[in-house]
Amino acid sequence: DFYAIWMEERGLWSTDEQDALQLIDKELDIYAKENKEKFDAHVKVLHMWDAESGMIDSWHKYCQKQMRDNFHTLDDKLIFSNTDTTKEDYASKRLNYPLEQGSIAAYDKLMSTLYSEEERRKLEWAIGSIVTGDSKHIQKFLVLYGGPGTGKSTILNIIQDLFEGYYSVFDAKALGSTSNAFALEAFKHNPLVAIQHDGDLSKIE
C-alpha cells in the first residue's frame, strides 16, 4: 500500500495519498502541455482524480503488487521549524518552534520550585536525550511518583508541548496484560516519546 511521497515544496514527506495523486496529475498535465507538438491528435490526460479513467485502480495495483519495497521509518528524529531538511531526513512533520538560544527564566523558576537539583537533572537528561536522538539507543523509561501537587503532571505537560506530534499516550496496565491484543497500538508509529498520566505499573514485571 501507499506509504509516503516526497514533497519538494514543503521539504517534507507526506503520508497523505491525496498529495501523491495531485502531484502525479500535475506532472501529467505539465508533460502533456510541453509535448503537445509531438502528438497529431488531441491529447486526453488520464487523471488520477477521474475514477472513469481507471488510473486510480492501476495506481493501487502498482502500490500493492509492483512497487519495489523501499520502506523507511519516518520521523525518527526531531525536526524543528528552522531545520533544513532533505529526503534523507525522512521527516513528515516539524515542531512549531525553532531550536535556538533564548531566555529560560520562567522555566528555570518553575523547575527549581518543583524539583530538587538531582530530580531536575534526571528529568532534563531524559529530555536532552530525546532532543539529541540518543533516547532511541538508551531506551529507558522514567516513573514520576508522589502526592498531588508535586509536579508530576507539570513536567509531563511540558514534555508533551516540547514534542508535539512526536509522542503518543499509552496504557501501562494494558502492556502487562496477555489478553489485550491492542496493548501496543500506541507504539505502531514509533513515537519518540510515550507518556501516561496516572499510570498503573502493578502488572509490569
Segments the model singles out, each with a brief description of its role:
Residues 1-18, 71-192:
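P-loop NTPase catalytic core of nucleic-acid-dependent motor ATPases
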Residues 1-90:
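Intein modules and their embedded homing endonuclease domains
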Residues 190-205:
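Conserved AAA+/SF3 P-loop NTPase catalytic/coupling segment centered on the Walker-B
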